[in-house]
Every structure is written in structure tokens, then in C-alpha cells.
């Protein structure tokens, strides 16, 4: 495979691997702080909502490679928070400096998602 993906949750990795019918991705259970790839092996690293492990990210991305990351916006999962908390709160969003990387562009992304069935329970279980 030309792509590798990992998550700390074995359940998330199993679910994603089941959906990968073409086996285009090599899936693994791993922490952001111990990425199972060689030094300077990645042309691009994409981090979605995981803890920032800047030193590890810099280790695996090739010189001149890209690091793309997504952080929760101010109203990320706000609907869940309205149900779960007496006083829902907005997230604080700030640009973060990652040693070894330069911020190229910041692109806000907004979308609404409706969840149903057992996915609702999963979403509540992972919401801080």
C-alpha cells in the first residue's frame, strides 16, 4: 500500500480496515507518539484531532514533506454538548507552532452531520 493509517483505538482501526475494500491502506493500532514507520518515510502526514506529537511528526515526515492537521473548531460537536452538559461550551481555537514545520495555510471547514442509531452512543462515549 502507498498509504498507512493508524489510530489508538483498535475498534476504529478494525472499522476503517473493513471499509477499505481495495486494501489501499496499511492499517495499524498505534499512538501518535510512536508512529510505526521509519524516519523520513512519509511524504505527507495527516493528523485529525489527535494529540500533537510534534517531535514524532517531524521524525517521520521527509524533508520538504507536508504535515496537514485538523483541530476541532469552536462549535465542534456542540449539539452533543448541548445534550450532555448543563452549560455547553465552545472550544478555544488557536494556531499552534510545530517545531520543524511552517504554517502554510489555515482553512476553516464547517459542516453539519446527523448521526443515528448506535453511532449516537459511540459519539457520546468519545465526547469530552
Model-derived segments and spans:
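Short alpha-helix immediately C-terminal to the canonical SAM-binding loop
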Residues: 13-14, 54, 77
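A short acidic, Gly/Pro-enriched loop at the edge of an enzyme's catalytic core
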Residues: 33-45
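Conserved class I S-adenosyl-L-methionine
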Residues: 58, 66-99
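A short, conserved alpha-helix within the catalytic core of class I
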Residues: 49-61
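Residues lining the SAM
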Residues: 43, 48-51, 70
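A generic structural signal for alpha->beta connector loops
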Residues: 2, 22-24, 64, 100-103
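C-terminal helical/coil "lid" or tail adjacent to the Rossmann-like core of SAM-dependent
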Residues: 102-105, 114-128
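Class I SAM-dependent methyltransferase SAM/SAH-binding core
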Residues: 1-35
Amino acid at each position: 500500500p502507498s498509504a498507512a493509517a493508524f489510530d489508538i483505538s483498535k475498534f476504529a482501526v478494525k472499522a476503517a480496515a473493513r471499509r477499505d475494500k481495495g486494501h489501499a491502506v496499511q492499517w495499524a493500532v498505534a499512538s501518535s507518539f510512536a508512529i510505526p514507520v521509519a524516519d523520513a518515510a512519509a511524504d505527507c502526514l495527516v493528523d485529525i484531532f489527535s494529540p500533537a506529537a510534534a517531535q514524532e511528526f517531524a521524525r517521520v515526515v521527509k524533508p520538504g514533506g507536508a504535515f496537514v492537521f485538523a483541530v476541532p473548531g469552536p462549535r465542534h460537536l456542540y449539539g452533543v454538548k448541548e445534550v450532555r452538559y448543563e452549560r455547553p461550551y465552545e472550544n478555544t481555537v488557536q494556531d499552534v507552532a510545530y517545531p520543524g514545520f511552517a504554517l502554510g495555510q489555515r482553512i476553516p471547514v464547517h459542516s453539519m452531520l446527523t448521526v443515528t442509531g448506535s453511532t449516537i452512543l459511540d459519539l457520546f462515549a468519545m465526547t469530552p
